[in-house]
Design a protein with these regions (language model features):
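Divalent metal-coordination and catalytic microenvironments
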Residues: 30, 65, 127, 187, ...
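Short acidic/histidine-rich active-site segments
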Residues: 29-31, 180-196
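Non-catalytic positions within long, well-ordered alpha-helices that form the structural scaffold/packing
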Residues: 16-19, 117, 174
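Histidine/acidic-residue-rich catalytic or RNA/ligand-binding cores of hydrolases
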Residues: 134-144, 161-171, 189-204, 230
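Short helix-capping segments at alpha-helix termini
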Residues: 54-63, 179, 208-213
Length: 230
């Protein structure tokens, strides 16, 4: 479907790996970027996830997969969410996972996020620590926090897989854990370089900075709440 498992056999092996690492629920979040030709329409994602879940059940793999989408930051995101053209995490209708660019925040970026919030959705911003502008200054994230956004750190960033700047920025964001809602994502793409097994390592790395209880909350209770209908 996107840039994850290449076939069902690999998907099943990734699921086994996730279960072995202690995961019981995963959110499938294919990218949505209308300008990239990646619509990831909710119904299509639901159908693919349902098919995967059937395969997991047949293989007796105790993993629940729920639909989601990673939405490219753009002016039309609020309208797409309201119109049902873009999905939410867990198909719960509450939280939208929105991805900023890896270089600069676009002009009007904060306003596009404000419109999403005003439309009644919560936002979790995906991997902000990998954005070059955020690596230079947390000013944009401070503005996002004022809107009530949560921030999702990528496991690989906390383990230095995306370079020292991403690691340093992830640490700077973790330092705001008293004030900012944070979650940690596996960002699972494959069986090796970006595997689900990294999530436990990332949690342990975060625990060195924020404590074990809070780090566990970032990989369990808080993301679980995001996929639960209000």
């Amino acid at each position: 479907v996107d840039d994850g498992a290449r076939n069902i056999a690999e998907a099943l092996e990734m699921a086994r790996q996730a279960v072995a690492a202690g995961t019981d629920t995963m959110v499938a979040t294919p990218h949505r970027g209308w300008f990239l030709g990646r619509p990831a329409r909710p119904q299509a994602v639901r159908e693919h996830v349902a098919g995967l879940q059937e395969s997991l059940n047949r293989a007796r793999i105790p993993l629940k997969v729920v639909p989601g989408v990673e939405i490219k930051m753009a002016p039309r995101v609020a309208d797409d969410l309201v119109n049902g053209e873009a999905g939410t995490l867990g198909d719960a209708g509450c939280w939208a996972l929105i991805e900023p660019p890896f270089d600069r925040i676009p002009t009007g970026g904060i306003e596009s996020l404000r419109k999403v919030v005003e439309a009644g959705f919560h936002i979790v911003l995906a991997h902000p620590e990998r954005c070059a502008e955020v690596q230079q200054s947390l000013t944009f994230l401070e503005a996002c926090a004022e809107l009530g956004l949560a921030f999702q750190l990528t496991s690989g960033s906390l383990l230095g897989r995306f370079g020292p700047r991403a690691l340093e920025t992830a640490h700077a964001i973790l330092a705001r854990a008293d004030d900012w809602p944070l979650v940690i994502a596996s960002d699972t793409h494959d069986l090796h370089d970006r595997s689900c097994a990294l999530l436990r390592e990332a949690r342990d790395a975060a625990a060195l900075l924020v404590g074990a209880e809070r780090a566990q909350e970032m990989v369990d209770a808080r993301p679980r709440a995001m996929i639960t209908p209000l």
